[in-house]
């Protein structure tokens, strides 16, 4: 174990814990012992809010790191929690943090697959380094019926189409790498997980979908039902900018990807964490607009393709509301607006 002067004490939520002095503060970080990413606090805050609302009986934090996620789930959501961590040094960090917080979480120095042989979980949290695809099948096999799986994906180069051959090799799809890429990327990941669940006669239903910084975060409910699996598959298809956005956009097919809702009604009634910060509250307001429209009206991009000056967000939303259109800021772009009308109507009202 490292010397004490190499530790840093951090407080997140209700938990005080230790992490390596050189822990990752921002960005995707590196795969190291005792890995802690401050940039994923929002991810954990939203997860805790969801779990306080859904109240599963037993949760698995499958890639423990410092143990911060599992410790917070146990204390703040009041759920029996198991943490698995294959890295021996990280496992020692988690044990130290359990003692520091006088917690009753269970910790195992085992692989993700091995821990699934010992328990049947109501909630499984998958936050690996990179893609979630190597782990999602095992999770869906070992989750209770109507249980939940939370996934954090950081392979955004593949999901956003910035490396087209990798996107096709990994997901069998084409994604346009432009201002709409993060909604496309989330829809691509949802579609892939829906298809994998359906192959097991299960329905994967997205509950909350988030893009932040270097990662996507999606929480699914998994329901054992071939009928519901078939219904979910009907929401997978291709999307054309020309017919889906406005005639000013060239015809260009993306997909196959998820064309259904990004959230369920649970996202509207989350039991928020105690003392939520401004970032959490602003993000939740944007998440709640996810399903006003499929994609969003990006006012800067529309101005670019029509060679006009960009309108302000405030004046654009005021015009839309004057026409009786419900609207809100999109989480996927700072110049994007989710609307209750067609995107074409929204663009033509604004411009």
Residue ranges: model-predicted function:
Residues 1-351:
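SAM-dependent transferase fold signal centered on methyltransferase-like domains
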């Amino acid at each position: 174990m490292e010397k004490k002067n190499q530790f840093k004490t951090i407080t997140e939520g209700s938990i005080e814990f230790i992490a390596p002095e050189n822990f990752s503060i921002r960005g995707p970080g590196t795969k190291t012992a005792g890995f802690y990413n401050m940039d994923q606090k929002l991810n954990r805050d939203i997860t805790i809010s969801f779990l306080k609302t859904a109240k599963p009986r037993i949760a698995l934090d499958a890639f423990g790191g410092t143990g911060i996620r599992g410790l917070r789930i146990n204390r703040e959501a009041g759920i029996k929690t198991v943490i698995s961590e294959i890295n021996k040094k990280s496992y020692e960090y988690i044990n130290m943090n359990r003692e520091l917080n006088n917690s009753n979480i269970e910790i195992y120095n085992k692989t993700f697959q091995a821990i699934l042989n010992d328990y049947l979980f109501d909630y499984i949290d998958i936050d690996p380094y990179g893609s979630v695809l190597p782990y999602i099948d095992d999770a869906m096999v070992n989750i209770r019926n109507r249980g939940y799986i939370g996934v954090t994906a950081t392979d955004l180069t593949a999901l956003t189409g910035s490396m087209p051959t990798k996107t096709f090799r990994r997901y069998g799809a084409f994604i346009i790498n432009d201002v709409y890429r993060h909604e496309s990327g989330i829809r691509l990941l949802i579609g892939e997980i829906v298809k994998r669940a359906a192959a097991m006669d299960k329905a994967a239903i997205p509950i909350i979908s988030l893009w932040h910084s270097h990662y996507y975060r999606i929480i699914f409910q998994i329901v054992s039902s071939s009928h519901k699996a078939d219904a979910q598959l009907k929401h997978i298809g291709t999307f054309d900018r020309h017919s889906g956005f406005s005639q000013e956009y060239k015809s260009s097919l993306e997909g196959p990807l998820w064309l259904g809702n990004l959230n369920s009604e649970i996202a509207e009634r989350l039991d928020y964490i105690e003392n939520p910060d401004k970032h959490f509250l602003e993000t939740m307001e944007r998440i709640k607009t996810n399903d006003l429209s499929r994609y969003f009206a990006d006012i800067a991009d529309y101005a670019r393709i029509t060679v006009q000056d960009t309108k302000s967000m405030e004046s654009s939303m005021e015009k839309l509301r004057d026409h009786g259109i419900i609207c809100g800021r999109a989480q996927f772009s700072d110049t994007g607006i989710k609307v209750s009308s067609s995107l074409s109507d929204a663009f033509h009202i604004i411009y």
